[in-house]
UniProtKB/Swiss-Prot annotation:
Positions bound to substrate: R41
Statement: the UniProt record of this protein carries the keyword Manganese: no
Matching SUPFAM superfamilies: Aldolase (SSF51569)
Domain of life: Eukaryota
UniProt protein name: Hydroxymethylglutaryl-CoA lyase, mitochondrial
Pathway(s) per entry: Metabolic intermediate metabolism; (S)-3-hydroxy-3-methylglutaryl-CoA degradation; acetoacetate from (S)-3-hydroxy-3-methylglutaryl-CoA: step 1/1
Chief location category: mitochondrion
Matching NCBIfam families: PRK05692.1 (NF004283)
Reaction equations catalysed: (3S)-3-hydroxy-3-methylglutaryl-CoA = acetoacetate + acetyl-CoA
GO cellular component, one term: protein-containing complex
Pfam family, one: HMGL-like
Organism: Bos taurus (Bovine)
Keyword annotations: Acetylation, Disulfide bond, Lipid metabolism, Lyase, Metal-binding, Mitochondrion, Peroxisome, Transit peptide
Function according to Swiss-Prot or TrEMBL: Mitochondrial 3-hydroxy-3-methylglutaryl-CoA lyase that catalyzes a cation-dependent cleavage of (S)-3-hydroxy-3-methylglutaryl-CoA into acetyl-CoA and acetoacetate, a key step in ketogenesis. Terminal step in leucine catabolism. Ketone bodies (beta-hydroxybutyrate, acetoacetate and acetone) are essential as an alternative source of energy to glucose, as lipid precursors and as regulators of metabolism.
């Protein structure tokens, strides 16, 4: 297993405390934000070389140690489609279960849901999309048909007391359709919420969104679904992830998805690399005086560990500025 080198300068300790400067506008933001760390699943699923199971387990444990309240651990998808996630059961069983930390797993179908439950999953996630063409190309059915396929999962989850999180892809743009109507995003989000998803993450899958587009989309969705049930999942393909996240914060959204070291993208959307780096998100939120419960120093150590294991450079600007990776 790769080992962590001591690459984090101690001067970062003072930086990481980020004595938040209060501003007159802070009152417009939530006082606390829940960060959903998607690196171990969304971040690693597209890596060409198979990441050893012990490395995945250590990464998840380090992220938990850093104080992240939610760490999406893996995906119970067919190894034929995503070979990187073939060790899903071993990962879920092998990680330390930190008190107060949730470890949701992606379940694309009922077979995956059953396997996840057998491995000890307490929360699962399902995926929808706001683009008909994206849905057709990925799973060869319509949006409505795709949601109907999840009905069995939601019913079984309800009976077993398992929480279900929903994802909506392509909320600000599609690689095939282009611009997506905010009304369509609102429609799909409302359906997932009415089906029983306690939280719906709105994903800018190809990272084309701007703050204006984010505002328009959320304005439509908030007419159908309470803000407490929403999260945003921004990609930094065009360098807009933090700006879009800030816009969502201003509109009351208090759950943010991000990936350590900015790992990951979407395997079906060409050029859609670059999830929002968790390190950069934590740095911004700390500067706004918004509580996350995340220790930036330990988070940076987790990012350094996985980047060294993958033999790659971090995509986090904060890590680049302080760790020299």
């Amino acid at each position: 297993m790769a080992t962590v080198k001591k690459v984090l300068p101690r001067r970062l300790v003072g930086l990481a405390t980020l004595r938040a400067v209060s501003t007159s506008s802070v009152g417009t933001f939530p006082k606390q934000v829940k960060i959903v760390e998607v690196g171990p699943r969304d971040g690693l699923q597209n890596e060409k070389n198979i990441v050893p199971t012990p490395v995945k387990i250590k990464l998840i444990d380090m992220l938990s140690e850093a104080g992240l309240p939610v760490v999406e651990a893996t995906s119970f998808v067919s190894p034929k489609w995503v070979p990187q996630m073939a060790d899903h059961a071993e990962v879920l069983k092998g990680i330390q279960k930190f008190p107060g930390v949730n470890y949701p797993v992606l379940t694309p179908n009922f077979k995956g849901f059953q396997a996840a439950v057998a491995a000890g999953a307490k929360e699962v996630a399902i995926f929808g999309a706001a683009s008909e063409l994206f849905t057709k190309k990925n799973i060869n059915c319509s949006i409505d048909e795709s949601l109907q396929r999840f009905d069995e999962i939601l019913k079984a989850a309800r009976a077993a007391g398992i929480s279900v999180r929903g994802y909506v892809s392509c909320v600000l743009g599609c690689p095939y359709e282009g611009k997506i109507s905010p009304a369509k995003v609102a429609e799909v989000t409302k359906k997932l919420y009415s089906m029983g998803c306690y939280e719906i993450s709105l994903g800018d899958t190809i990272g084309v969104g701007t703050p204006g587009a984010m505002k328009d989309m959320l304005s439509a969705v908030l007419q159908e679904v309470p803000v407490t049930a929403l999260a945003v999942h921004c990609h930094d393909t065009y360098g807009q992830a933090l700006a879009n996240t800030l816009t969502a914060l201003q509109m009351g959204v208090s759950v943010m998805d991000s990936s350590v070291a900015g790992l990951g993208g979407c395997p079906y959307a060409q050029g859609a690399s670059g999830n929002l780096a968790t390190e950069d998100l934590v740095y911004m939120l700390a500067g706004l005086g918004i509580h996350t419960g995340v220790n930036l120093q330990k988070l940076l150590e987790a990012g350094a560990f996985i980047c060294q294991a993958l033999n790659r450079r971090t995509n986090s600007k904060v890590a680049q500025a302080t760790c020299k990776l």
